[in-house]
Curated annotation (Swiss-Prot):
GO biological process terms held by the UniProt record: translation
UniProt cross-references to SUPFAM superfamilies, sorted A to Z: Translation proteins SH3-like domain
Gene from which the chain derives: rplS
InterPro entries according to UniProt: Ribosomal_bL19, Ribosomal_bL19_CS, Ribosomal_bL19_sf, Translation_prot_SH3-like_sf
NCBIfam families: rplS_bact
A Pfam family matched in the record: Ribosomal_L19
Organism ancestry: Bacteria, Pseudomonadati, Pseudomonadota, Gammaproteobacteria, Legionellales
CC terms in the record's Gene Ontology section: cytosolic large ribosomal subunit
Protein's UniProt name: Large ribosomal subunit protein bL19
Keyword annotations of the record: Ribonucleoprotein, Ribosomal protein
Ribonucleoprotein among keywords: yes
Ribosomal protein recorded as keyword: yes
GO molecular function: structural constituent of ribosome
Length: 115
């Protein structure tokens, strides 16, 4: 039973081209949005504040500030709704989960770039 699950998971994950990114990186996620009968791509750019490594159920959380309001979105890594993930900037952080950014505003919420 366990081998069948692993076989299905590897089959699902092989086709996806996923860049190497971690918490602190700024990414742009192209999401497929269906409106009525037409489909378009919507870009969501922000800082990765968490990654969850669970095989096929892997996910990551992206945070951005839009019109002064913090917006977080959780994406399933192997979801068919994700068209592409692009890493714009590498962040230099010392934590795996950056939930403390929720309480920071302005320049304090800025993450240093990795050199």
């Amino acid at each position: 039973m366990n081998n069948i699950i692993q076989l299905l998971e590897t089959e699902q994950t092989q086709g996806k081209e996923i860049p190497d990114f971690r918490a602190g990186d700024t990414v742009t996620v192209q999401v497929k949005v269906k409106e009525g009968n037409r489909e378009r791509l919507q870009a969501f750019e922000g800082v990765v504040i968490a990654r969850r490594h669970r095989g096929l159920n892997s996910s990551f959380t992206v945070r951005k500030v839009s019109h002064g309001e913090g917006v977080e979105r959780v994406f399933q890594l192997y979801s068919p709704l994700i068209a592409s993930i692009k890493v714009n900037r590498r962040g230099d952080v010392r934590r795996a989960k950056l939930y403390y950014l929720r309480n920071l505003r302005g320049r304090k919420a800025k993450i240093k770039e990795k050199i």
